[in-house]
């Protein structure tokens, strides 16, 4: 795909697609709950479709009329052994969270995925589930897909300290704990996104959260609910950055989810001096309207507890930093190496090919700001990573002459099927 965008500034209002994390979980909770769950504004990206198809294969009736999705849950014990292996596509969330559910079911299921997902570590989720009584066998000693899970109807509660800051691993243990005998205790070293905990309560479940300690009693029964999915702040992040770095821009993003475990990017924008307004806050829905306009930015440091609250936004934050005055340092983000790609290396390579000055490190990047971007000599390949594709497309807005050849642009379908339509709407051309 060729990108040649001569933007005179981005203008307009936009409603970004539904939050990917909440979309996954709404299908999962609806499938293990008893009764009907109705979901509004779900993200119909490839990852969420993988979750839907997996639960259909487990015997759950899921209807989509194009407006709302209806999940006819019969309770977790009614899930059935799949007739064939479950295709997880490129979705780490689908794989890891579903593993927690399968761990407590008395049958065997095999999960497989695409080349990218098959390289990602699954031992981090296999270890606690094995401690609880599930049998899990992966492709290697490190446990990678394809992975076979033989669940147990007699899971035992455990006390578990998460070795990595991962909402996916935490959520897998919570889903397994719902089926276990006794009280499961999960301790986080760094707080990660809290959608699973909050949605468990919404579906009538019991959970106690005290700072970084989570207690989940076993043997729980959940009830179907009506869910409205807010806009995804990870998708909104691309427009927030575009509005800040493209001259003469002013954007309003409506109904964006602002769960406090996901708003690290807003704090970074404010720390860098970006003109950002948070309007029309809905405390119950945890959503707001966000308004940005082109700004003079300065470098900052991003590290520590902030990292889990913006881990998925770091690629586009790196682009933001290239346009800020001074140096931006990102550290404590080694988790980027095991995302859809090694995002430390891939982000640095892509932006450096356009004239940026980024030094990759073991756990982040050092970015010298104030750089003018140009079209690269060679094509940039997303390597199947949706966030890399969107980062490059936003970077193209800053290139005055020439065009960018973006290979495997279809990866963007993972989380934002209407991305290029929205880009055309806001920029006036593509």
Curated annotation (Swiss-Prot):
Subunit structure as annotated in this protein's UniProt entry: Monomer.
EC code(s) of this entry: 2.5.1.19
Secreted is among the record's keywords: no
SUPFAM superfamilies: EPT/RTPC-like
GO biological process terms, semicolon-separated: amino acid biosynthetic process; aromatic amino acid family biosynthetic process; chorismate biosynthetic process
Enzymatic reactions: 3-phosphoshikimate + phosphoenolpyruvate = 5-O-(1-carboxyvinyl)-3-phosphoshikimate + phosphate
Record keywords, A-Z: Amino-acid biosynthesis, Aromatic amino acid biosynthesis, Cytoplasm, Transferase
Record localization: Cytoplasm
Signal sequence extent: none
Active site: 312 (proton acceptor)
Residues that, per the record, bind 3-phosphoshikimate: 20-21, 25, 166, 168, 312, 339
Protein's UniProt keywords contain Transferase: yes
Metabolic or biological pathway, per its Swiss-Prot or TrEMBL entry: Metabolic intermediate biosynthesis; chorismate biosynthesis; chorismate from D-erythrose 4-phosphate and phosphoenolpyruvate: step 6/7
Primary location: cytoplasm
PANTHER family per UniProt: AROM/DEHYDROQUINATE SYNTHASE, PENTAFUNCTIONAL AROM POLYPEPTIDE
Enzymatic class: transferase
Role summary: Catalyzes the transfer of the enolpyruvyl moiety of phosphoenolpyruvate (PEP) to the 5-hydroxyl of shikimate-3-phosphate (S3P) to produce enolpyruvyl shikimate-3-phosphate and inorganic phosphate.
GO molecular function: 3-phosphoshikimate 1-carboxyvinyltransferase activity
Matching InterPro entries: Enolpyruvate_Tfrase_dom, Enolpyruvate_Tfrase_sf, EPSP_synthase, EPSP_synthase_CS, RNA3'P_cycl/enolpyr_Trfase_a/b
Protein name, UniProt field: 3-phosphoshikimate 1-carboxyvinyltransferase
């Amino acid at each position: 795909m060729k990108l040649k965008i001569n933007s005179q500034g981005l203008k307009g209002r936009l409603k970004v697609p539904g939050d990917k994390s909440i979309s996954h979980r709404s299908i999962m909770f609806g499938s293990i709950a008893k009764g009907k769950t109705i979901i509004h504004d779900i993200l119909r990206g490839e990852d969420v479709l993988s979750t839907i198809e997996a639960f259909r294969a487990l015997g759950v009736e899921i209807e989509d009329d194009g407006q709302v999705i209806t999940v006819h849950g019969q309770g977790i014990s009614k899930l059935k052994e799949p007739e064939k292996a479950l295709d997880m596509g490129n979705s780490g969330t689908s794989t890891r969270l579903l593993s927690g559910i399968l761990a407590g079911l008395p049958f065997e299921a095999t999960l497989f995925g695409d080349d990218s997902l098959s390289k990602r570590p699954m031992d981090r989720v296999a270890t606690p589930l094995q401690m609880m009584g599930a049998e899990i066998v992966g492709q290697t000693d490190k446990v990678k897909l394809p992975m076979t899970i033989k669940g147990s109807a007699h899971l035992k509660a455990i006390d578990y300290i998460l070795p990595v800051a991962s909402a996916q691993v935490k959520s897998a243990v919570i889903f397994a704990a719902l089926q276990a005998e006794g009280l499961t205790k999960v301790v986080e070293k760094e707080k990660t996104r809290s959608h699973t905990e909050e949605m468990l309560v919404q579906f009538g479940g019991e959970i106690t959260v005290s700072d970084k300690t989570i207690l989940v009693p076993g043997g729980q029964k959940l009830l179907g609910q009506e869910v409205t999915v807010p806009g995804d702040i990870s998708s909104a992040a691309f427009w927030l950055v575009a509005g800040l770095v493209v001259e003469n821009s002013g954007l309003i993003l409506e109904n964006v989810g602002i769960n406090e475990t996901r708003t690290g990017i807003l704090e970074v924008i404010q720390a860098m001096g970006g003109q950002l307004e948070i309007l029309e806050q809905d405390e119950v829905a945890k959503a707001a309207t966000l308004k940005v306009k082109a700004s003079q930015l300065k470098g900052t440091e991003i590290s520590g507890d902030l990292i889990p609250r913006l881990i998925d936004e770091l690629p586009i934050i790196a682009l933001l930093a290239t346009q800020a005055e001074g140096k931006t340092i990102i550290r404590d983000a080694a988790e980027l190496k095991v995302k859809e790609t090694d995002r430390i290396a891939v982000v640095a390579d892509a932006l450096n090919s356009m004239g940026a000055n980024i030094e990759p490190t073991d756990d982040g990047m050092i970015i010298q700001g104030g750089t003018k971007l140009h079209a690269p000599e060679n094509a940039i390949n997303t390597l199947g990573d949706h966030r890399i594709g969107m980062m490059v497309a936003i970077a193209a807005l800053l290139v005055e002459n020439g065009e960018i050849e973006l290979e495997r642009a279809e990866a963007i379908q993972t989380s934002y099927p209407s991305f290029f339509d929205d880009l055309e709407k806001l920029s006036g051309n593509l």
